[in-house]
């Protein structure tokens, strides 16, 4: 199955051997996304809502670069470092998915950088 690598303009180099997203058979797979700037520094330190917005804007950029939109998202994997941030994360999340919500799960865990509060990986079906 052929795949297309999706790298939006202005994307920094990943910390590990992966790409921001891939497109295969009309499905966009967005890698785990954190609130990083182009130099892989965490932005909005201590602010879960702002980090969530940054993460979702980055995911939106990957999906739009592939030719889709946020309405095409069918599944999200959410990783957060502290359940105390759950309400703030959900408030921002709901802004990006105002209609039919995608399936998802949410796990509390440690992340690759100590100041990162949230990571989201996404699957979107475009061209439906």
Swiss-Prot record:
Listed GO biological process terms: nitrogen utilization; uracil catabolic process
CDD domains membership: YjgF_YER057c_UK114_family
SS bond partners: none
GO cellular component: cytosol
UniProt GO molecular function: deaminase activity
KW Coiled coil (keyword) present: no
EC number: 3.5.-.-
Top-level taxon of origin: Bacteria
Classification via SUPFAM superfamilies: YjgF-like (SSF55298)
Keyword set, alphabetical order: Hydrolase
Family assignment from sequence similarity: Belongs to the RutC family.
Its job: Involved in pyrimidine catabolism. Catalyzes the deamination of 3-aminoacrylate to malonic semialdehyde, a reaction that can also occur spontaneously. RutC may facilitate the reaction and modulate the metabolic fitness, rather than catalyzing essential functions.
Protein name in the entry: 3-aminoacrylate deaminase RutC
């Amino acid at each position: 199955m052929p795949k297309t690598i999706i790298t939006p303009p202005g994307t920094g180099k990943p910390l590990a051997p992966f790409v921001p997203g891939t497109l295969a058979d009309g499905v966009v797979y967005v890698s785990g996304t954190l609130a990083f700037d182009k130099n892989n520094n965490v932005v909005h330190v201590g602010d879960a809502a702002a980090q969530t917005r940054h993460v979702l804007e980055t995911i939106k950029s990957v999906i739009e670069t592939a030719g889709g939109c946020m309405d095409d998202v069918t599944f999200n994997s959410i990783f957060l470092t502290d359940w105390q941030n759950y309400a703030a994360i959900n408030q921002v999340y709901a802004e990006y998915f105002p209609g039919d919500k995608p399936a998802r799960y949410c796990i509390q865990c440690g992340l690759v950088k100590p100041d990162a509060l949230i990571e989201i990986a996404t699957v979107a079906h475009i061209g439906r």
